[in-house]
Amino acid sequence: MTAEEFVKAVKAEKEVSLELYFSKHHETLIGNLINDIIENGATRDNLHELINQVLNENCYSLLMALDGEASLGDTQISYKLFDEEENELTGSGEIESAAYEQFMQ
């Protein structure tokens, strides 16, 4: 797995979560809260965009922290992340670049 593939997997997981939150076929706590807010006048599209942006920023921040480019909590250190074949995914800046492309553009 490359750093770019790792970032794409994080994005895919975010998309699955977002779809689940807005699904009419699955009941989740977040989905119930979304439905309550919609019943009080917010639009589904506006909520979807808001939650999408929140998840994008959270995923981006976490990936930046894993790559040593931002703090995680109040600590900024470089982490080493390896795939199952012991290839290092961090340290080269590839996560930072791929994360920006996937979550911030």
Feature-to-residue mapping (PLM):
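Short acidic DE-rich linear segments
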Residues: E4, K8, T90-Q105
